[in-house]
């Protein structure tokens, strides 16, 4: 502490002793957030999150296939979850051609699973267990009325649900688990992680405007956009996604929209979007303190959204 005080005193003395001719103006690196999520380098957009859009679409089609009682098999659902480029696993040709899949990004964040491969493998296996159980427990009993101890269907007058012997809907368990183990985990614990944003020479390259080979964006810009894509990747207009928030997918986007519809949380969609565009603007401005402040906001608000929806489902039974 004495050393710190001494150092501070000497520094202050040096400032006082310097001639005013030598004083340098303090440059404030302020960040102005744009009105929309639009970022350009010259005349070209620097925003890219195609991989996230692809995985959201894959997730939606795979979850829907859980209810395709006429065509789905254990093999077909497993193939959708662990898609290999060129295989005809989906109805969309672009998804079939993609080298992306869901399994590789399940429980795969840097912060939580980089050194914890055994837990990652166990979580991946849970998804495969849901597939096995849906085919082998629920499918044979779709015409049976479910009762405690017996899988089958529950009709409540508005829709029919298909459950296991304990009342669990495997299709919902699969979809909601994707929301957590892929979308939220990749966003919050991977692409917004300082270990990923600042990996290697990312800061230096961003400071110097060095883009990835044959791309318009720096690596740091792209990592931020990939986090953004897990929430807004299928938005009708990704530059102004809150115009349709809650309508663009059945995962995080829907969750944020539903929570935002609650008068008690009516600003949460705006707060999340504002933090995303402010953080991206901070990266462009090379202001990493502001960037990290926005990461904290996004993590808090997305976690709050998931908690609110969890309570809603628990209260609904």
What are these model-predicted stretches?
Residues 19-22:
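Bacterial signal peptide processing site
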Residues 14-17:
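C-terminal motif of bacterial Sec signal peptides marking the signal peptidase cleavage site
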